[in-house]
């Protein structure tokens, strides 16, 4: 069964504040999960593109590339912006980054570092900011910091599933 495309996914942001620390813990775990999945894979497996979609390295690099957006959206919440900054829906940064030329351990370490920074900033938000909301520009719906954490985690899971599918696909060809 084919998975739903990320941009077709609908979100219901109704988590209660008591779920916030659990979400942040899961967000912090994502780089470790990815590292466990990819660290022992051969280079040829890491860079292969299936159906002209991103390779494993490009999926990891994409998550790194998006941390700048997530960090900026924290700034938007702090500044009380009505609308959160938009993502580059064409993923130009990822498409131009040449992540396939990078060492996978460097990519996973970089992801771990930028994600730790994001989680640290999310933990530092005060109650006023945590209860505020801004409009997500693509979804056209209000988003609180806890909702952003949920959104980022679901995006992480989407790419973890993609990486698992790539590994399975390459292994079934061998």
Q: Where are the regions that the model predicts?
A:
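Charged, low-complexity, helix-prone segments enriched in Lys/Glu/Asp/Gln
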Residues: 20, 92-95
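Compositionally biased, intrinsically disordered low-complexity regions enriched in proline and serine
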Residues: 8, 12-14, 21, 100, ...
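Short coil/turn linker and secondary-structure boundary residues
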Residues: 15-18, 41, 54, 99-102, ...
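Acidic/histidine-rich alpha-helical segments that form the ligand environment
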Residues: 25-31, 36-37, 94-132, 152
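Short, contiguous alpha-helical
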Residues: 1-14, 45-90, 133-174
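Structural signal for well-ordered, non-membrane alpha-helices
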Residues: 31-42, 68-71, 75, 112-126, ...
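Short, contiguous, helix-prone interaction/anchoring segments in small proteins
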Residues: 19-52
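Amphipathic, non-membrane alpha-helical segments in soluble helical-bundle scaffolds
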Residues: 17-27, 57-60, 101-108, 145-149
